[in-house]
Amino acid sequence: MGFELLPHTADLKITAWSSTVEGCLAEAARGLVSSFADVGDAPSARTVAFTCEPGPAPELLVELLDEVVFVVDAEDLIPVRVSVARTDAGGLTGEFGVVERASLPPVGPAPKAVTRHDLRFWRAGASWRCEVVVDV
């Protein structure tokens, strides 16, 4: 499990990997958060539940990262923990463990939007990998 952040013109490209689809999605969300906040080992103050409509893995990735952007922009919270599970219908359910945005030092600009440019989700041997570009 892990992620890598790569500069991409005026954007940010996130590559994530894990042994499961859900793990890969969670790693991408962690990667997005680490691009703008120094989460370290900060404990969550509370949880925020989310759901994503059923769809193929690339669309679930966009929906999940859109949820991160929403929580940051609309609620001024930063996810420090991500829990993701697939629903029987093929969607997602989960929780973000969050803290107030002001409680963590910024390390970069907050994301503005998740794009579908260069969006990829694929199986690579025993692991799942994804790539997504985020407008910062």
Language-model-detected regions and their locations in the chain:
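N-terminal intrinsically disordered, cationic/polar leader segments
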Residues: 1-136
